[in-house]
C-alpha cells in the first residue's frame, strides 16, 4: 500500500483556500463595479419620486383653486372684511383667498372684496411685448375672452368676479379648451361677498333710482351690483406692460391691431421720430357696433300728417279741459279721415339689416368697414342713437377721410365732457386709476353684454380725470373696435334710462330720479378729480356739471 505524502494534502487545502479567497475577491470587485450603476438607479428613482410629488401638489392646488387662508390680515384694521367662504359654507375654511381690498369712500361701493392676482398665469412669457389689453370678464361671457385672444396674440390681463365654485370651474374649463387663452391671458379673481347685494351706502338713500324699486321683493333680487371699476383696477395694476389698451369684453379689435399699435408708439413717441410733442399722451381707438337685426320683414306705413303740437295744449286753461279734450278728438278724427281719403300715407321699408353678422364676417380692412357701414348697413358708430356726444369728439368724418392716405398719422382732438372712448395709454403716468365707487347693475341670470346696463360713467369719469390731469388725445386712423351685440332685435336706443341719464348729465337739469352713478360722479368724483389735479372744483373745465347743478 502506498501513501501520498502529507505535504500534498496541505497543498490541496491551501489550494482550496486560495480558490475561496479568489471567489470572494472577484465578488467584491464585481460589487465595486456595480455600485455606480446602483447609485444612478437610486438617483433616477428619487428624481422621479420628487417630480411625482410636485405634480401631485400642483394638481391638488388646481383642484382647490389655489385658495388659501388669510394669515396676515389685521382684523381690527379691516372691520368690514368678510371672511366667510365664497360658497357660504362655514365649515370649509380653505375657500378664503389670501388678499383683500376694502372700499372706504363716502358714497358708492363701501364693502370689502377679497382678490387673488394671477389666479392663473399665462404660459407665454411677456418678453418682447410692449402693450397689454386690460379687461374684465362677466362669467356669463367667458367665451368672448377667447375671441379677443385669438386676434390680439399678446398679453391680456383679465379680472373675473367669482361668486361660487362653478365660476372658477368655468374659468379653468376655458383655459383648458383655448390655446390662445392659456398662452396669453392672466386671470385675476375678485371674490363676491355673501352680502354684496346691499353695497350702496345706506346713509345716502336719496341716490337710489326709484325706477328700479318694485313692491315685489323677488323682482328686486333679480339684479346684482357689479364692481366694474374694481375689476378694471385689478387688471390694470397687474398688467405686465406699462402701455395698456382698456376694452370691454364684448368688443373685438381689428386683425393686426397689435402690430399697428406697437408701430404707432415707435413712430409717434421715439425721440428720433417724435411726431407728438406731449408727455401725457393717450390714443383713442374708434368704436363701432353691429346694427341691430330686425325680425320684421313687412314694410312700415308712415303718415305725412303731423301730430297736434303740444304747445297748443299748454294754452288751454283748467276750466276748458273738457272742451280741449273734445277738440283734440275732433282733430285726430279729421286727420285720420283726410289721410285716408287723399292717400297721403307713404310706405317705407324698415332700414335694418336682416343678416346676422358673426365674428368671422367682421371687416378686416378699413375699406371693408366702410362698406359695412355705408352700403350694407351692418355696422354703425357706437352709441349713435343713445349718446351722440359720447363719441362725437372722435370726428368719424375725418377718420374715414384718411382711408386713402398711406400710413396716416394720429390726429389730435379736443376733449369735451361726456367723451367715452376706449384708450391706449401708459399706466405709469396716471395719477388716478378708475374710481371704484362706480358700479354696474346686472340681471342675476344675465347673458347680456357688459354694455347693456344703464350705468355708463365708469369710463366717462376716468377720461375726465385724464383730461383734467393734462392728457392729450389722439385718434388712431387704422385701428378700430366692433361691439358684438347680443340682442338680435335691439334698436340700440331702447335704453330709456340711458337717454334720461345722459340728458341729466348733459343738460344739468334738476331731475328727482337720479341714477346712482350720476349722483356719485356729479357730487364726488368730478370735484375730487379737480382737486387732485390742482383745479378749482367750483369752476368748469370742460362744460361738466358742477355740484350745485346736480
Curated annotation (Swiss-Prot):
Transmembrane segments annotated in the record for this chain: 37-57
The keyword Transcription is annotated on this UniProt entry: no
Location, primary (coarse class): membrane
Annotated spans, Disordered: 1-29, 81-100
Cytoplasmic side: 1-36
Sequence ranges on the Extracellular membrane side: 58-550
GO CC terms in record: membrane
Keywords, sorted A to Z: Glycoprotein, Membrane, Signal-anchor, Transmembrane, Transmembrane helix
GO molecular function terms listed in the Swiss-Prot or TrEMBL record: glucuronosyltransferase activity; xylosyltransferase activity
Compartments, as annotated in UniProt: Membrane
Keyword Iron: no
Name of the featured protein: Glycosyltransferase-like protein gnt12
Organism: Dictyostelium discoideum
Gene: gnt12
